[in-house]
Amino acid sequence: MSAQPVDIQIFGRSLRVNCPPDQRDALNQAADDLNQRLQDLKERTRVTNTEQLVFIAALNISYELAQEKAKTRDYAASMEQRIRMLQQTIEQALLEQGRITEKTNQNFE
């Protein structure tokens, strides 16, 4: 699908961006989220300069993204460790099962 121009409003300013039709809702949601963040930031910080607010919001979003990436890395490492432990447990159980089967076969001979 080719991108099509979409008009969005960010903090009172019109912005035209190209967006694939199937991502239009996500773009509008992102714009709404950014508008809310900017409004909240303006109220909390009393900063009135829009450019400063945008930079502060961008830094906050970048920080949040870095935190989420770190969480994802930690989770992936934890899952890899659990998978290795499960593999070892399964391998050990299979070895034990093989020994039991071997002993049972020897007893019947």
UniProtKB/Swiss-Prot annotation:
**Would I find RNA-binding among this entry's keywords?**
no
Q: Which GO terms describe its cellular component?
A: cell division site; cell septum; cytosol; plasma membrane
Coiled-coil ranges per UniProt: 21-99
- What top-level branch of life does the organism fall under? Bacteria
Signal peptide position in this chain?
none
Which keywords belong to this entry? Cell cycle, Cell division, Coiled coil, Cytoplasm, Septation
Q: Where in the cell is it found?
A: Cytoplasm
Any one GO molecular-function label of the UniProt entry: identical protein binding
List S-S links within the chain. none
Pfam families from the entry? ZapA (PF05164)
Subunit relationships:
Homodimer. Interacts with FtsZ.
Member of which family?
Answer: Belongs to the ZapA family. Type 1 subfamily.
Q: What is this protein called?
A: Cell division protein ZapA
Origin species, per record, is: Escherichia coli (strain K12)
Gene encoding it? zapA
